[in-house]
């Protein structure tokens, strides 16, 4: 009854909200918005209209009084200051709770309560469910649960605003030193790769960086687009290949690696970047990597959801879906991992576009999913490609999932091979960092209503998967025999807000996955390569991705190039080295003047450094 009343109030209130949304017939990409401007503004209520409506429903129906503003201690932040007002206003009372489940009835009760209250389910397994909600909603949630669940929870994140703030890049880069136009002679210059992966990077930095890699390594790297987003942004990718594809040689075996389907899962985007950078820079030096690029085309797509990814940097760090308009214009967005055409089951969420799992009103309504599918089909039908593997990186829970996602009653015909390779991938990850990744079918953990066939309007995806997934589509439609969805770090301590120091270790884990996958596919023809010795090995403490960047050089660089400008022509035969620095204004004053530094820091507002700085790439002779 409460659920029906909630929906009734929602429909009545939606009319007023819809009329308040400006109409527009043409969708054009918006110019980049500096987060510092957003954070420094003082909106009367920065919550999205849907969130305001949801909170009003809860307060009205369950009689919850609006709590006083939550107070954050200034010393809690690693930056020694509280989050900016915009973050506090949006997330100030939000927490993440983990509920422990003991049986199906408890899972079903929690599913129903989360559905009624429109809660954001972060992750779920047959043993636990992580839910994000406002503190003031906790009494309402507990009131809808059986007694056994009312004490079966623990707080995972009790200061969500603070945790969100720490995921954005710090104001100052790490390890940058020296004067403008010169590399330091006292120690090696900062390593290009390490510097880039010290922080999460916005799309405005990632795309110029990809262009630079394509220009630096034209022999085996080419920048391509696999489609256009709903707001008109290109979906960028790098094609890594050192082989040739002709009709005489037969179809070119192709492996696709994607990230960022869900916008808030930044670690997926950063991991794709790290893996492709490692493959690019190790080509010609590593026998294993050289063999991989000779035998396969690698399509590396950092994010298939550029609109959503940009939105997480500019407005809402925890945005999940794309930014496509829906039937409820104040609830935009389609879940791109439920929008694919194979066994699409979007009827379950069709009535609620505000759901984080909303799959659209029909298969492939999600623009970016449609674009990637069309590109993949065109590759196989017209460009002599044979897509043999698909790796889809998500977060979180440290799990390797194989098809099928839509149903456990359907057994994939290559199940034995999928399980064998999946266990091998998990072993390769342990080799890199000693982290444990579980291996299971993507369907396991799906919890539906006990009479799902008679009540198709509701479901609770414990494992985060269902019909319409990219995993199932690539496996079934284009016959990518070895298709996996890999949920990256961690197991819940940080959730979607994984600290940036995990970027490089996670990248090493998936690099090992790529090596293991390649060696498995090449099989008996790879005796000339010692694959195991090429893996990242924690016991060896490999701190360098490429030893060439550890050489010191006391000569001033003769070439400067701004990453956001046009790329130069580079002679691939020249043996040059590159380092990355930040463009800054330097003076002859002592840079170590502590008094000046302290005074400057007091005057500065909190900013997101990565969206304000400009990278330069310096060529060393």
From Swiss-Prot:
Question: Which cofactors does the annotated protein need, by name?
Answer: Zn(2+)
Outline the segment boundaries, as ranges, of region: Disordered. 544-621
Q: Which InterPro entries match?
A: Peptidase_M14
The record lists glycosylation at: 378
Q: Which residues form the propeptide?
A: 21-171
The intrachain disulfides are 331-354
Q: Which Gene3D superfamilies match?
A: Zn peptidases (3.40.630.10)
Q: Which GO terms describe its cellular component?
A: extracellular region; vacuole
Q: Which residues does the annotation say bind substrate?
A: 262-265, 320, 337-338, 395-396
Tell me where the signal peptide lies: 1-20
| UniProt-annotated location(s) | Vacuole; Secreted
Output the GO biological process annotations, alphabetical, semicolon-separated.
cell wall organization; proteolysis
Listed binding positions for Zn(2+) are 262, 265, 394
Q: Where is the composition biased (Acidic residues)?
A: 570-607
* UniProt keyword list: Cell wall biogenesis/degradation, Disulfide bond, Glycoprotein, Metal-binding, Secreted, Signal, Vacuole, Zinc
Span of domain Peptidase M14: 199-521
Gene Ontology molecular functions: zinc ion binding
Q: What's the record's note on cofactor binding?
A: Binds 1 zinc ion per subunit.
Give the family from UniProt. Answer: Belongs to the peptidase M14 family.
> Function, please?
Inactive carboxypeptidase that may play a role in cell wall organization and biogenesis.
Name of this protein: Inactive metallocarboxypeptidase ecm14
Tell me the organism: Aspergillus niger (strain ATCC MYA-4892 / CBS 513.88 / FGSC A1513)
């Amino acid at each position: 009854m409460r659920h029906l009343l909630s929906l009734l109030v929602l429909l009545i209130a939606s009319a007023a909200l819809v009329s308040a949304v400006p109409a527009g017939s043409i969708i054009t990409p918006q110019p980049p918005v500096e987060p510092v401007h957003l954070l420094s503004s003082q909106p009367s209520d920065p919550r999205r209209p849907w969130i305001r409506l949801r909170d009003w429903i809860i307060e009205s129906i369950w009689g919850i009084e609006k709590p006083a503003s939550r107070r954050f201690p200034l010393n809690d932040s690693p930056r020694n200051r509280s989050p900016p007002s915009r973050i506090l206003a949006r997330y100030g009372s939000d927490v993440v709770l983990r509920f422990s489940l003991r049986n199906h009835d408890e899972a079903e009760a929690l599913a129903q309560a989360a559905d009624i209250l429109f809660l954001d389910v972060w992750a779920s397994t047959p043993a636990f469910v992580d839910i994000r909600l406002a503190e003031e909603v906790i009494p309402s949630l507990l009131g809808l649960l059986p007694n056994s669940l009312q004490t079966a929870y623990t707080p995972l994140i009790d200061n969500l605003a603070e945790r969100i703030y720490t995921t954005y890049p710090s104001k100052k880069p790490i390890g940058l030193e020296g004067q403008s136009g010169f590399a330091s002679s006292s120690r090696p210059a900062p390593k290009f790769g390490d510097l880039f992966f010290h922080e999460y990077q916005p799309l405005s930095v990632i795309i110029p960086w990809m262009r630079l890699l394509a220009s630096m390594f034209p022999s085996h790297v080419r920048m391509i687009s696999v489609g256009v987003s709903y707001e008109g942004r290109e979906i960028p990718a790098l094609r890594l290949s050192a082989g040739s594809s002709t009709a005489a040689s037969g179809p070119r075996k192709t492996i696709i690696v994607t990230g960022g389907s869900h916008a808030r899962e930044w670690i997926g985007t950063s991991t794709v970047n790290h893996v492709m950078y490692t493959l690019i820079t190790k080509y010609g030096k590593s026998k294993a990597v050289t063999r991989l690029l000779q035998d396969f085309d690698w399509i590396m797509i950092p994010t298939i959801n550029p609109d959503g990814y940009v939105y997480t940097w500019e407005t809402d760090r925890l945005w999940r879906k794309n930014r496509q308009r829906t039937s409820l214009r104040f609830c935009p967005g389609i879940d791109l991992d439920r929008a694919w055409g194979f066994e699409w089951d979007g009827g379950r969420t069709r009535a609620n576009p505000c759901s984080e799992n909303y799959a659209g009103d029909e298969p492939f309504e999600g623009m970016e999913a449609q674009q990637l599918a069309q590109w993949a089909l065109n590759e196989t039908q017209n460009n002599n490609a044979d897509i043999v593997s698909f790796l889809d990186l998500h977060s979180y829970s440290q799990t390797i999932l194989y098809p099928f996602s839509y149903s456990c009653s359907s057994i994939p015909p290559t199940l034995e091979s999928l399980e064998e390779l999946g266990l091998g991938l998990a072993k390769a990850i342990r080799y890199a960092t000693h982290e444990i990744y579980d291996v299971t079918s993507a369907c396991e953990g799906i919890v539906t209503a006990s009479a799902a066939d008679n009540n198709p309007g509701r479901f609770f995806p414990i494992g985060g998967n269902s019909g319409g997934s990219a995993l199932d589509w690539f496996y079934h439609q284009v016959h990518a025999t070895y298709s996996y969805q890999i949920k990256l770090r961690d197991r819940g301590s940080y959730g979607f807000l994984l600290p940036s120091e995990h970027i490089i270790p996670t990248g090493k884990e998936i690099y090992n996955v790529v090596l293991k996958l390649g060696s498995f596919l090449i099989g008996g023809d790879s005796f000339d390569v010692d694959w195991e010795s090429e893996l990242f090995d924690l016991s060896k403490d490999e701190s360098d991705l490429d030893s060439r960047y550890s050489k010191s050089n006391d000569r001033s660089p003769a070439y400067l190039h701004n990453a956001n400008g046009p790329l130069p022509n580079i002679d691939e035969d020249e043996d040059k080295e590159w380092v990355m620095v930040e463009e800054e204004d330097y003076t002859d004053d002592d840079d170590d003047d502590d008094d000046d530094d302290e005074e400057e820091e007091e005057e500065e507002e909190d900013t997101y450094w990565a969206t304000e700085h400009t990278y330069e790439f310096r060529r060393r002779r």
